Swiss-Prot record:
Taxonomic lineage: Eukaryota, Viridiplantae, Streptophyta, Embryophyta, Tracheophyta
Signal peptide: none
Main localization of the protein described in the UniProt heading: nucleus
Tissue specificity annotation: Expressed in leaves, flowers, guard cells and lateral root primordia.
Composition-biased stretches (Low complexity): 208-224
Domain HTH myb-type: start-end pairs: 9-65, 66-116
GO biological process entries: abscisic acid-activated signaling pathway; defense response; positive regulation of abscisic acid-activated signaling pathway; positive regulation of DNA-templated transcription; positive regulation of wax biosynthetic process; regulation of abscisic acid biosynthetic process; regulation of abscisic acid-activated signaling pathway; regulation of DNA-templated transcription
Function noted in UniProt: Transcription activator involved in the activation of cuticular wax biosynthesis under drought stress. Binds directly to DNA consensus sequences found in the promoters of genes encoding very-long-chain fatty acid-condensing enzymes involved in cuticular wax biosynthesis. Functions together with MYB94 in the activation of cuticular wax biosynthesis. Involved in drought stress response through abscisic acid (ABA) signaling. Mediates ABA signals that enhance plant resistance to drought by reducing stomatal opening.
Identification of the protein by name: Transcription factor MYB96
Annotated Gene Ontology cellular component terms: nucleus
Gene: MYB96
Residue ranges for the DNA-binding region feature of this UniProt entry: 37-61, 89-112
Positions in coiled-coil regions: none
Inducers of expression: Induced by drought stress, salt stress and abscisic acid (ABA). Induced by infection with the cauliflower mosaic virus (CaMV). Induced by cold stress.
Amino acid sequence: MGRPPCCEKIGVKKGPWTPEEDIILVSYIQEHGPGNWRSVPTHTGLRRCSKSCRLRWTNYLRPGIKRGNFTEHEEKTIVHLQALLGNRWAAIASYLPERTDNDIKNYWNTHLKKKLKKINESGEEDNDGVSSSNTSSQKNHQSTNKGQWERRLQTDINMAKQALCEALSLDKPSSTLSSSSSLPTPVITQQNIRNFSSALLDRCYDPSSSSSSTTTTTTSNTTNPYPSGVYASSAENIARLLQDFMKDTPKALTLSSSSPVSETGPLTAAVSEEGGEGFEQSFFSFNSMDETQNLTQETSFFHDQVIKPEITMDQDHGLISQGSLSLFEKWLFDEQSHEMVGMALAGQEGMF
């Protein structure tokens, strides 16, 4: 069953302390000091138990006890210690020497407990409000981010459209300018060179001459990559043609100047055989020499114009065969020889 409480003993007084009892207890503790609380009732003659004497001294009579309202620091300390130690008020009061355990307990039960409950409730509300505000702010932030992204995308699209329109607007005037500038000024291209060369060849060569040289072109086609009537028109061929034409002009002149003299030689011999007398032969030969000199000057000019393109073209691509050139020369010189014979006979008739 344990030891019975001391207050239940016979002759032990209960209830509040009187001022006289307080004075006796304070005078004894000042003389002997606080301690050995079991001997205090017997030495002082107080009809109180030892526990009642200790609590009366600790909570009310000892010096340095602070009365009145608790400060904010004391409240925080009490709340913190109560959370750590629980309802052990004496241990909590040891950390606050100016406050008694009874005062701390009473203040906790009457004020701090209710205040802390309100703070927790308001904190929960605040947390709910903060969480709701956080969620709403997050939603707003997401929506703002989304709106900013959409606006940025729209601006990028608008900028791309504007750049495209500017590029097209720049292309249009440039194209119109190029078209307007290309009208008055000719543009040198490979196609234009081909057209020009084909038109030039069509003007220079007669289609009827191609029919007469069909026999010679069949043989020349086997050796030359291009037929006599076809000209491979390109910038390179025209450049080569011009270069070879400039190089071959002295050759053509030498050929034209030398060939008529050799070919007119048999003409004078033939005319001399037809004559009978030596004087007539010498006179005719003298006249014929003068005429042949004039003819050589005239024929050299024709040879320069005829042989130049044919020799150069034949050296480059073999476009006009050698047979057609020889036929043309024979026809030309035969016609000149007949005219020359007629002129000589007319001169003889005048003399005789």
